[in-house]
Amino acid sequence: MLKIAMIGCGAIGASVLELLHGDSDVVVDRVITVPEARDRTEIAVARWAPRARVLEVLAADDAPDLVVECAGHGAIAAHVVPALERGIPCVVTSVGALSAPGMAQLLEQAARRGKTQVQLLSGAIGGIDALAAARVGGLDSVVYTGRKPPMAWKGTPAEAVCDLDSLTVAHCIFDGSAEQAAQLYPKNANVAATLSLAGLGLKRTQVQLFADPGVSENVHHVAAHGAFGSFELTMRGRPLAANPKTSALTVYSVVRALLNRGRALVI
């Protein structure tokens, strides 16, 4: 049995608990949350993981088999780095956090000090295995194009680029590097950061973002070229019922990673 400490129990974390409910190989027996979210966390835990303890920090002498982060960027430094330094393997969903200068190196160094490993999840995008394999032979270009309905860009710099309320055709709100995209649109950085880390890096991965009234879901398109040949991938992601801003595939990515840790045969 694999015993897991989960950081965060919002839309992603609660959905993970639900999907793992009743699994005898993988058990979430610790859930780490912040004080202001404790009440709703305890409700979700009571329903889907009644034997789990709700904590605000992992004690220094507490050593789960695995830590999974489902809490957002701030949890990386607060919880994941200390766990890695203590030798506890970790799984990270908030890959966009690694767009910040030095964050990827911080995680890698913590894992090296703890003689363990941190796994970055593919989340809402597919093809990461192919892209990472292609990098071995040499990549020439990776271009990511993201499309969302105009209203999904409310509260972002896109509001200064165009009138989101009156768009009738797709409008490009950003065209540049993944590094620049992460700075301007940090809440939309996970997919671009994941592709960058698997492929050419933040500076060389190209990103185009569109506010598109013709789509009702998040559309991801990846085009990669290199010594291996080329590939193109288009995904139309449905949102999580509990949180329209979160991809359902992100939750499934977490569950798959955890189940793989507890099973003898994985793919």
UniProtKB/Swiss-Prot annotation:
The lineage of its organism: Bacteria, Pseudomonadati, Pseudomonadota, Betaproteobacteria, Burkholderiales. Pathway: Cofactor biosynthesis; NAD(+) biosynthesis; iminoaspartate from L-aspartate (dehydrogenase route): step 1/1. Belongs to the L-aspartate dehydrogenase family. It catalyses: L-aspartate + NADP(+) + H2O = oxaloacetate + NH4(+) + NADPH + H(+); L-aspartate + NAD(+) + H2O = oxaloacetate + NH4(+) + NADH + H(+). The active site is at 220. NAD(+) binds at residues 124, 190. This is L-aspartate dehydrogenase. The keyword Ribonucleoprotein does not apply. InterPro entries: Asp/hSer_DH_NAD-bd, Asp_DH, Asp_DH_prok, L-Asp_DH, NAD(P)-bd_dom_sf. Keywords: NAD, NADP, Oxidoreductase, Pyridine nucleotide biosynthesis.
